[in-house]
């Protein structure tokens, strides 16, 4: 929350030394207020910056980037197209397949969010995830998807810090919730597998995320 409050006071546009993912050749195109928010995300989510990626989870457990006994896919994210990302993130791709891909880039965009962002921005499926495109997707997250956060950054009348942080926590797992909240999740058994009803649909239950916890339950 202190980091988000710093955004409200308009941090200078100078990027701090040693920020994960920074290189002399690749710098953010974001305006200072948005860039300040992005710093919080990069530190918690994407140490490789624009080139970062993960393979998702299996039964709620994050998958390793390295796959035992198999060659890891060449994940040059800034050269990856939107359609390639979607093709490599379909549920039918097994956890031990090195081609499997989930969240990508500086802002750890997941496939569902990427689809919405590309539609909002008018990009084609052939568009690559260049740094500028990733920055524009982040702008979509703030301006189109998480408006309470954007309103708080702009100091709009009626904006609320707690709501802003909660929106941030909903989008990025590394950000803790600002207060205790109830969320609806898939119920899991003792082996951490999703419990399903007679029709095969996941059984839902409400759980409480304590202040500072991830909205999505990761430690």
Predicted regions and their residues:
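Cell-wall polysaccharide-cleaving catalytic domain and substrate-binding groove, primarily
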Residues: 3-128, 133-219
